Amino acid sequence: MNSPQNVSTKKVTVTGAAGQISYSLLWRIANGEVFGTDTPVELKLLEIPQALGGAEGVAMELLDSAFPLLRNITITADANEAFDGANAAFLVGAKPRGKGEERADLLANNGKIFGPQGKAINDNAADDIRVLVVGNPANTNALIASAAAPDVPASRFNAMMRLDHNRAISQLATKLGRGSAEFNNIVVWGNHSATQFPDITYATVGGEKVTDLVDHDWYVEEFIPRVANRGAEIIEVRGKSSAASAASSAIDHMRDWVQGTEAWSSAAIPSTGAYGIPEGIFVGLPTVSRNGEWEIVEGLEISDFQRARIDANAQELQAEREAVRDLL
């Protein structure tokens, strides 16, 4: 194993760096959980001007944690500086939906954030940049950012479905009394919204088909809506949105993207037309990670039940795209 002194430092940009998700995320990155425990990291924290004080406090705490792999921290409100030389970026900062605000307005307001950030990535990031959009509405925010970065392959932009994926595993593990690591071949199709389709059609646990172990009515009437609405449930109980679980899922996604995995995951990537899903949207698909790239798990048989739910997600994402067409 190479010592940290002999491995090139990876620059990681985190937007919304003073927020709750980043407060959990940054410690995991600094601890080597994305690039490995032999790879030094430099953190670049992007915030809006009025939140720079909060980001400064976060940086102070990171330094006080004395991570052996943490080489430097930059705090800035300038996107060009934040993405300069970045090898990985977590786009966490987003404008939350205001009371009574229409989804079209939410999309447009976030377009004003993710468009300029996409351009800054295009102009400044390293050639091997990987961008994970966490801030919602994540799928269409990823589309906007990618459209503003024509020199960066669209496959270098992802939106996070891993939280939904992990929630699906958790619900099954609780239902069946099994460990989360025992489950394989779960997928969450579509949009990171209440329309999403957590799918257990191909799932196994300990060599058994999950569909043989759970009741179909429970699957349709409890499991799917519970996973899809878990974020709202946590807000109702906690009084705040999911933060630590979102950060943990973002780490899972980026680690697997960088280091590779043959285990199925769910990632929102640019549609290639696979499974009859139209191109031009970022959609959750069953994936594995090989050679630093996500590959779609192909050849799966799709039932009419699945088809209807996958199509509903594609239509929702196409409608979101139309709402921000002037930004693309």
Curated annotation (Swiss-Prot):
<feature type="binding site">
    <location>
        <begin position="134"/>
        <end position="136"/>
    </location>
    <ligand>
        <name>NAD(+)</name>
    </ligand>
</feature>
<keyword id="KW-0520">NAD</keyword>
<dbReference type="InterPro" id="IPR001236">
    <property type="entry name" value="Lactate/malate_DH_N"/>
</dbReference>
<feature type="binding site">
    <location>
        <position position="103"/>
    </location>
    <ligand>
        <name>substrate</name>
    </ligand>
</feature>
<keyword id="KW-0816">Tricarboxylic acid cycle</keyword>
<dbReference type="InterPro" id="IPR010945">
    <property type="entry name" value="Malate_DH_type2"/>
</dbReference>
<dbReference type="InterPro" id="IPR001557">
    <property type="entry name" value="L-lactate/malate_DH"/>
</dbReference>
<feature type="binding site">
    <location>
        <position position="110"/>
    </location>
    <ligand>
        <name>NAD(+)</name>
    </ligand>
</feature>
<dbReference type="InterPro" id="IPR015955">
    <property type="entry name" value="Lactate_DH/Glyco_Ohase_4_C"/>
</dbReference>
<feature type="binding site">
    <location>
        <position position="97"/>
    </location>
    <ligand>
        <name>substrate</name>
    </ligand>
</feature>
<dbReference type="InterPro" id="IPR022383">
    <property type="entry name" value="Lactate/malate_DH_C"/>
</dbReference>
<dbReference type="GO" id="GO:0006099">
    <property type="term" value="P:tricarboxylic acid cycle"/>
</dbReference>
<feature type="binding site">
    <location>
        <position position="136"/>
    </location>
    <ligand>
        <name>substrate</name>
    </ligand>
</feature>
<dbReference type="GO" id="GO:0006108">
    <property type="term" value="P:malate metabolic process"/>
</dbReference>
<keyword id="KW-0560">Oxidoreductase</keyword>
<dbReference type="Pfam" id="PF02866">
    <property type="entry name" value="Ldh_1_C"/>
</dbReference>
<feature type="binding site">
    <location>
        <position position="117"/>
    </location>
    <ligand>
        <name>NAD(+)</name>
    </ligand>
</feature>
<protein>
    <recommendedName>
        <fullName>Malate dehydrogenase</fullName>
        <ecNumber>1.1.1.37</ecNumber>
    </recommendedName>
</protein>
<comment type="function">
    <text>Catalyzes the reversible oxidation of malate to oxaloacetate. Exhibits higher catalytic efficiency for oxaloacetate reduction than for malate oxidation in vitro. Almost equally active both for NADH and NADPH on the bases of the kcat values at pH 6.5, but catalytic efficiency for oxaloacetate reduction is 50-fold higher with NADH.</text>
</comment>
<dbReference type="InterPro" id="IPR036291">
    <property type="entry name" value="NAD(P)-bd_dom_sf"/>
</dbReference>
<dbReference type="GO" id="GO:0030060">
    <property type="term" value="F:L-malate dehydrogenase (NAD+) activity"/>
</dbReference>
<dbReference type="Pfam" id="PF00056">
    <property type="entry name" value="Ldh_1_N"/>
</dbReference>
<comment type="similarity">
    <text>Belongs to the LDH/MDH superfamily. MDH type 2 family.</text>
</comment>
<comment type="subunit">
    <text>Homotetramer.</text>
</comment>
<feature type="active site" description="Proton acceptor">
    <location>
        <position position="192"/>
    </location>
</feature>
<feature type="binding site">
    <location>
        <begin position="16"/>
        <end position="22"/>
    </location>
    <ligand>
        <name>NAD(+)</name>
    </ligand>
</feature>
<feature type="binding site">
    <location>
        <position position="167"/>
    </location>
    <ligand>
        <name>substrate</name>
    </ligand>
</feature>
